[in-house]
Amino acid sequence: MSDTLLTLRDVHINFPARKNWLGKTTEHVHAINGIDLQIRRGETLGIVGESGCGKSTLAQLLMGMLQPSHGQYIRSGSQRIMQMVFQDPLSSLNPRLPVWRIITEPLWIAKRSSEQQRRALAEELAVQVGIRPEYLDRLPHAFSGGQRQRIAIARALSSQPDVIVLDEPTSALDISVQAQILNLLVTLQENHGLTYVLIS
């Protein structure tokens, strides 16, 4: 069995930039221009580039939110479960839900497991990411930026994903908190055999 989870071959993503008076696109913006990559099980693939170079577009492609304009996007084997951790944890967390519901949101959407099972899983994952279980009934605004990112990571873990895409997961955090989150990601990768795509 291959350890390759995802493969991109000569992938291009173009967006319309200008249309003529008939509504036909005459110019395109080339957000991704001929990229090749492989994502292998258990590794961390780093995507580094300056602002506006297409990193976030690539993240959306990997998550299935965009389709290639040209080239091949290949998921090896069965349907892969992908999760994403965003740059700004507060904007990615539902402000009206208690934290335990946020952590298990992917399971609720998929209609998997009972509420009691989801609550137990939320407590287990909270401990793994360093959130005290007695705080799980609080809303996101009650937590610091670093704690909110830990909650977002726990949510990504709840569906047992094959790949987690991390879109600048520490850039909105203080330096000391950045180190804590990166150390947490390393520990979780070792414990769960996770595969990361880390965008910076």
Regions found by a protein language model. Give the residues of each.
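The feature captures the beta-strand-to-loop junction immediately N-terminal to the Walker
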Residues: 48-49
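Helix-to-loop junction immediately C-terminal to a conserved catalytic motif
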Residues: 63
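Conserved ABC ATPase "signature" region
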Residues: 117-134
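Conserved ABC ATPase signature
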Residues: 139-143, 147
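Hydrophobic anchor residue at the start of the ABC signature
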Residues: 153, 181
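A short, proline-enriched helix->beta-strand linker immediately N-terminal to the Walker B motif
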Residues: 158-162
